[in-house]
Amino acid sequence: MANEVQDLLSPRKGGHPPAVKAGGMRISKKQEIGTLERHTKKTGFEKTSAIANVAKIQTLDALNDALEKLNYKFPATVHMAHQKPTPALEKVVPLKRIYIIQQPRKC
């Protein structure tokens, strides 16, 4: 048990613990410090995104006001003249053929 504590406190080559062998492959251990850094970065990111969201909401409100004014100035008939006409008949898409190729089994 004392050896385990000394192993944890002793400096490692390359600044990381040695790899663990599992299933015939060497797997590196994840460091706990790296996970702590990720959590701190996310909290800072949330604060900046909240500020950005407020700015986006304000710009969307301004755009909505401008669109309402345009809708009042130009009636719906003018907008309908510039829209793409709807087709009278729907296009029928032919079904794709499924080609089954007979191949011998791989043994």
Swiss-Prot record:
One of the record's GO cellular component terms: nucleus
Single GO biological process annotation from the record: ribosome hibernation
Segments for region (Disordered): 1-23
Superkingdom of the organism of origin: Eukaryota
UniProt key word Ligase: no
Keyword Transmembrane helix annotated: no
Function as written in the Swiss-Prot or TrEMBL entry: May play a role in the early stages of epithelial differentiation or in apoptosis.
Protein name: Death-associated protein-like 1
Native source species: Homo sapiens (Human)
